[in-house]
Amino acid sequence: MIPDFLIRAFLIQALRIRYANACFAMAVVAMTAMMPAPSMPQQAANGSTPSAGTVTFTLDFPQSDPEHYSIAIDASGHGRYECTGKVAEDSEEEAYRTEFQMSAGNRVRVFSLAKQAQYFTGAVDSSNGKLAFTGAKVLSYQDGQRSNSAHYNYSNLAPVQQLTALFQSMAATLEYGRRLAYYHRYQKLALDDELKRMQTQARNNELSEIQSVAPVLQEILEDSSVINVVRARAKELIEMGNSVAAGH
């Protein structure tokens, strides 16, 4: 039989161990509460995400139509087109704005060319005063760390030349979309000639991002009051835009 004093000693030791464990657990909780929370990026702490890059092309060319336009493309491919000009000869000059989603291939191309052009940090204009004026152009790049702009009439830099050609062909497409929406609403008889010109330029690879004007082309295609030849032209352009956007 175990003596009583040994039992009491055993119980006292067990209580001491439980007390020590409890104190240790409380100390761990207290130390955890005193530790600072893991740091977050400054943008997240401010409730916003890190800013992505945006490439913008602007053209100002008096006596042309439109006289002013700009196209901005962000890193996700979301595009915004703004212009000021007449949509038709007998219309008033007005501001116009539309948004679209750029094809993945051209989105990658835009940002690759911007990188090759060092995000427009250096001299871009050729400084050749003998060249004809073709409009005051600006290429700009903005992200969380940079905000650069380059002004030029003509550039000898291949990446800038390619960006200029791409943005101008996009603007031509978006202007077709603007005019088609106007003609569809007010002058349906003008649709055939307009779509015929658009088809010719598209077949000659003079237009980019045809899918960006697919909504107005679809409206024309589905309008039974429009003659069949016009609707057929709209359908062909929709298919061309879908093919290019899919990378075919």
Report each predicted region and the residues it spans:
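N-terminal secretory signal peptides that target proteins for export/translocation
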Residues: M1-R18
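Bacterial N-terminal signal peptides
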Residues: A22-A33
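Short, well-ordered, aromatic-rich surface patches in folded extracellular/luminal domains
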Residues: A37-Q63, A123-H248
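Charged, amphipathic alpha-helical segments
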Residues: Q42, A104-S127
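N-terminal secretory signal peptides
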Residues: N46-S91
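N-terminal post-signal-peptidase region of extra-cytosolic proteins
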Residues: F57, P66, E93-R97, Y119-D125
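Acidic/histidine-rich, surface-exposed loop or edge segments in extracytoplasmic proteins
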Residues: R80-T98, K196-T200, A214-Q218
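A short, exposed loop/beta-hairpin motif centered on an aromatic-Gly-Thr core
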Residues: E94-Q101, A150-Y152
